[in-house]
Amino acid sequence: MRRLLTFAVLVCALALPAGVAARPSGTTDGTLSVKDARGIITIQGRGGVIGSFAKGSVTINDPVDGDGTGPIVTGDDWSKDKSETATIWGGTKVRFRIIGGTFRVVVRGRGVNLSFVGKGGVILNGYGTDDDGSYAVNGGDYNLIPAFALPFALSATSP
């Protein structure tokens, strides 16, 4: 009986951390996918953004040092510090990401592709060309990016 009790305690001790690790994190997080956009995409939120653009610039404001990875940008032709917490990078074939914590990301350009997972405010504003790209929210269907500022809150319950 004692062996059975010891075995049961051991199984529970091993199963509990595995169950906690398997639990989905960020169940209130929403997702945004942007494909081949032309215009200005603004994200102010908490979570993670990974993206790239063919030509343009990205401004990343990371107001809290150490609450995530901080901005990581590659392929830029130039950069300029805007403030103590914000930097602008520009060029062609630029890739960027910021994972974790709060941030503000503003991408201006063409050939913009990005993914955002988290919660926050988003503004999509196309340049008014024939093809300003498309976006999808929370795994839904892709819609055309409008030629006017379209603000919305992103979370798991966003339409």
Describe each model-derived feature in a short phrase.
Residues 127-159:
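Edge beta-strand at a domain terminus
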Residues 36-135:
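Predominantly extracellular/secreted and cell-surface proteins with exposed
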Residues 23-32, 157-159:
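Short, polar/proline-rich extracytoplasmic segments that appear immediately after membrane translocation
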Residues 1-8:
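Bacterial N-terminal signal peptides that target proteins for export
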Residues 16-23:
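Sec/Tat signal peptide C-region and signal peptidase I cleavage site
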